[in-house]
Amino acid sequence: MPQQIELRNIALQAAQPLVHGVSLTLQRGRVLALVGGSGSGKSLTCAATLGILPAGVRQTAGEILADGKPVSPCALRGIKIATIMQNPRSAFNPLHTMHTHARETCLALGKPADDATLTAAIEAVGLENAARVLKLYPFEMSGGMLQRMMIAMAVLCESPFIIADEPTTDLDVVAQARILDLLESIMQKQAPGMLLVTHDMGVVARLADDVAVMSDGKIVEQGDVETLFNAPKHTVTRSLVSAHLALYGMELAS
């Protein structure tokens, strides 16, 4: 399995250019946070990595490398990169139980799909009464439960990399904290490389090792998390950090 995945000069276009020359490097055991405002190109960059671009959007330049060798996004999805989506409800077939979803995911990737394995993954993400959860349909579960189930599926994939696209969006504060605890636990126990897409600098401060800031489809600043919080250079980065510090009655040093 690869130790590093690199996005090199990715460009995306629809009727007009959307993403311009984006380069990112994911490394095993490190969390790279991709931050920026809505419409900055974060989710499109993830979609390009996984080969799931929306209709009408095409990649016009760039390549993806695994340990320095060119690779197709389709060869990465699921096997080498597990995904935790922004809206978990849209990721599940409403006609299938959690057991069916989990089992089919495992079988598609050639992983063990016995009930003991599925139960262990569900228990690992803190969902109580795994036998009952496996019988549930998506509409019978809260957003927080579905997000935990997505994380359980990522655990079942045993992929060396994870893309987590706004994993705490639309969750209450308690559910957000639990999801962050789970992601932190996965990093400690399995040490995958993680691309964490978020607009929440509090999430960045807690989980990230490195940060890339996007604005208008471009990476405008990139570096380790401590440097970006203490000495942000670009105006977009300064605005993000200042807004985060203001929540705690603090100001960014001039």
From Swiss-Prot:
Family annotation (InterPro entries): AAA+_ATPase, ABC_Ni/Peptide_Import, ABC_transporter-like_ATP-bd, ABC_transporter-like_CS, Nickel_NikD, P-loop_NTPase
Compartments, as annotated in UniProt: Cell inner membrane
Domain ABC transporter: 2-241
Domain of life where this protein originates: Bacteria
Disulfide bonds: none
Leader sequence residues: none
Protein name, as recorded: Nickel import ATP-binding protein NikD
Phylogenetic classification of the source organism: Bacteria, Pseudomonadati, Pseudomonadota, Gammaproteobacteria, Enterobacterales
